[in-house]
Amino acid sequence: MCGFLRVHDPHWLDEAYSDAIAAADTGLVMRNISIACKVATVLYWAMKERGEGRYLDAAGGYGMLTRLMRDLGFNFYWKDKYCDNLLVPGFAYNDSLGACRSVTAIEVLEHVTDPVGFVKETLDEAGAQTIIFTTELYEGEPPRPEAWWYYAFPTGQHIGFYQRRTLVALGARLGLTLSSANGLHILSKSPVNDHLLKFLTNRWMSRLGPWWIRRRLGSKTMSDHELMLKRIV
């Protein structure tokens, strides 16, 4: 048993996704800010990114994480089959851009019916060998319905729930190794040491590190602004 807890027949998904982003997701903004800071420290110090790499935020919602990562100096692109690109027009990913070094998928795996298929398809489409993602994990027996907010029953959108061993098994199916710390999970052919990941994503590193990184890489905020103005005229 791998600890994967899922809904057998989520027949209500069309109704649940009449709005791609649930109105009850009041943590969306703060979550994206926090995740952007953690991902930045991991890419810069653990994966040695120095501004040359290309990255994809899969199932990127309105484009908030992509915008934040570009503001920090990373060459991020957006893709989402179900949501409008409101915040990074002009930076949607397509095959002509070439392969990506890594893919992010923030709060996505709990929404999919086939996580192995999703991870494989996402990595194949981006030409990447690393996926960085978040999803809340549970330990031991499945939590009682009234004891775990992450079920989010009223929204109907969360249909799959994981333990650490679930993610290990998922990665093994695809030849990937799991690294996990402080709510950030990485499946990769070149795994990050868990102790390093824990250090890079701790409270102080994820607060102070991104501002150093932004100075070193150079923010894309204004260059993107100028590019958008040129496209308007």
Model-predicted regions and their roles:
Residues M1-S102, I106, V116-E125, T134, ...:
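Conserved N-terminal segment of class I S-adenosyl-L-methionine
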